[in-house]
Amino acid sequence: MELQPQFNEFLANIRPTDTQKEDWKSGARTLRERLKNFEPLKEIVVSTFLQGSIRRSTAIRPLGDKRPDVDIVVVTNLDHTRMSPTDAMDLFIPFLEKYYPGKWETQGRSFGITLSYVELDLVITAIPESGAEKSHLEQLYKSESVLTVNSLEEQTDWRLNKSWTPNTGWLSESNSAQVEDAPASEWKAHPLVLPDREKNEWGRTHPLAQIRWTAEKNRLCNGHYINLVRAVKWWRQQNSEDLPKYPKGYPLEHLIGNALDNGTTSMAQGLVQLMDTFLSRWAAIYNQKSKPWLSDHGVAEHDVMARLTAEDFCSFYEGIASAAEIARNALASEEPQESAQLWRQLFGSKFPLPGPQGGDRNGGFTTPSKPAEPQKTGRFA
């Protein structure tokens, strides 16, 4: 069964909490204001914006005392052809020492900042273009479309367009609804560059393109795409002992988007469809004990699976095969309790059981006195 009410409750149980959302917004706003007012960097910083799973609404609730991870991009006007990656990043050390003493560390392509309530990942980038083209891009990066700290789920009308403004109520609804994504010619061919200390080179990155692709895919899937990503991430976390460490994060998200058809009608249907498509699409690759090459939505020459080993991909493929069998049975079941128990084999106790009026089994079924633990059968049981 589709059990959409139970899926809705499950999703509410695994989304970041309202407090966590406010924490990362506060952290992002505070950092933005501090950068804006830090005199040595005033002429360098163009804007800062949220990226990553937080911005794309594909993050799941951290377990235990783990803090949310928040990616913040700093867009600068630095000339990457005249400055080394190390020198570019070193410009920000006085800022970090002033506002985050003892709380920051240098990473390969970013700075990590550990606060009591959130983990910030500060990514320094530069606009590689020059002249009028650079000016147009700076306008985009200074626009509400980029600066918003709301996630895609919170701002469903969002478009990548410097003319977009947040929909704050019924008065602005008609105006925001008329704004569509800007033509690809205005943004797609213009990724940012970011410094890599370890390789001592500048590489291309296009977080806005990833955000825009996610927003469009979610609309085409009736709002189910970002929730399906969350569900698969939760399944992976619940079954981590039976799965390889990778893929996770964005590569996992990309694999889901690659397999999910447009027009998704429900969570249950979407899960079965994307797993079945994943298995059929990569069967030959799996049989060859290899892994796929998947182009990044923002920088076409980047393989999203570059750091994933063939061994891990094949192990993950086997995990999806086992999970798909359970998901098919859960969707096919016509008994609410049985269906829910099967979904719980994948997602654990965060997936609720239907209430007493949720449907009865034939043969004397009685409502359990407490939530049942999943039966341990098969790879993920």
Curated annotation (Swiss-Prot):
Changing residue 69 to K: Nearly complete loss of enzymatic activity. Induction: Part of a CBASS operon consisting of cap4-cdnD-cap2-cap3. Changing residue 71 to N: No longer makes cyclic nucleotides. GO terms for molecular function: ATP binding; GTP binding; metal ion binding; nucleotidyltransferase activity. Primed for activation by Cap2 which conjugates it to cellular proteins; activation is target protein-specific (green fluorescent protein does not activate the enzyme), but which protein(s) activate it is unclear. InterPro entries: NT_sf. Disulfide bonds: none annotated. It is an enzyme of class 2 (transferase). Coiled coil: none annotated. Belongs to the CD-NTase family. D02 subfamily. Mg(2+) 3 binds at residues 258, 260. Binds 3 Mg(2+) ions per subunit; 1 is probably structural, the other 2 are probably catalytic. Residues 348-381 are annotated as: Disordered. Keywords: Antiviral defense, ATP-binding, GTP-binding, Isopeptide bond, Magnesium, Metal-binding, Nucleotide metabolism, Nucleotide-binding, Nucleotidyltransferase, Transferase. ATP acceptor binds at residues 51, 109, 196-197, 204-205, 307. The active site is at residues 69, 71, 121. Has an N-terminal catalytic domain and a C-terminal helical domain. This is Cyclic AMP-AMP-GMP synthase. Changing residue 377 to A: CdnD-GFP fusion cleaved by Cap3. The record marks 51 as: Important for GTP discrimination. Its EC number is 2.7.7.-. Monomer. Crystallizes as a Cap2 homodimer bound on each side by a CdnD monomer. Cyclic nucleotide synthase (second messenger synthase) of a CBASS antivirus system. CBASS (cyclic oligonucleotide-based antiphage signaling system) provides immunity against bacteriophages. The CD-NTase protein (CdnD, this protein) synthesizes cyclic nucleotides in response to infection; these serve as specific second messenger signals. The signals activate a diverse range of effectors, leading to bacterial cell death and thus abortive phage infection. A type II-C(AAG) CBASS system. ATP donor binds at residues 53, 56, 69, 71, 210, 233, 250, 304. It catalyses: GTP + 2 ATP = 3',3',3'-cAAG + 3 diphosphate.
